[in-house]
Amino acid sequence: MPKTMGILGKNIGMTRVYGEVGQAIPVTVVQAGPCKVLQVKTNATDGYNAVQVGFENKKSSRVNKAEAGHFAKSDSEGFYFVREFRVVDPATYNVGDMISVDALFKAGDIVDVQGTSKGRGFQGVIKRWGFKGGPGGHGSKHHRAPGSIGCSAYPGRVVKGKKMPGRMGNDTVLKKNVTVVDVRIDENVVLLKGPMPGAKNGLLKIYSK
């Protein structure tokens, strides 16, 4: 992962905006922050440099005692999402600081976005890997089967990494070099060019570059 500061956000959905000469630009609307610094980790105390942030407030009645003690250090009730950003110099941040979208990004910036792809469940090789499949008719009984998965006497086994049916999606995906189309400070919204990983209301980590 990039060793830069970033912000947490929620994937609201997609829409389009229009550029200066009228071109339609597909964008993903992300509710980005505000995030609160919960902990600052350093090489001396934790073995690595990082800034831990919380996003989306949670009622104190929904927080267990261990979480409540941790959140109390930053004078917070609670957060639904707690994540870390690896940074080179954590000394620039203090516990309790608020991180807003306009402090990190502006229109035209290039960022990296991390999310969790949509889970598709157990899928076959055609949907999962794009296999061509077998013959469509004429007595064929393996329209969507993978076909042979190995060799004969040598090596006499299925090789590691063979593409086969299995669980598809629900993976961590990092999309690099995404353009920030617009930042709307009053709404804590950032518009990112193109689609982002994951479903609506999914959590996104946006890294500055």
Swiss-Prot record:
GO terms for cellular component: cytosolic large ribosomal subunit. Keywords: Ribonucleoprotein, Ribosomal protein, RNA-binding, rRNA-binding. PROSITE patterns: RIBOSOMAL_L3 (PS00474). GO terms for biological process: translation. Coiled coil: none annotated. GO terms for molecular function: rRNA binding; structural constituent of ribosome. Part of the 50S ribosomal subunit. Forms a cluster with proteins L14 and L19. One of the primary rRNA binding proteins, it binds directly near the 3'-end of the 23S rRNA, where it nucleates assembly of the 50S subunit. PANTHER family: 50S RIBOSOMAL PROTEIN L3, LARGE RIBOSOMAL SUBUNIT PROTEIN UL3C. Belongs to the universal ribosomal protein uL3 family. This is Large ribosomal subunit protein uL3. The lineage of its organism: Bacteria, Pseudomonadati, Thermodesulfobacteriota, Desulfobulbia, Desulfobulbales.
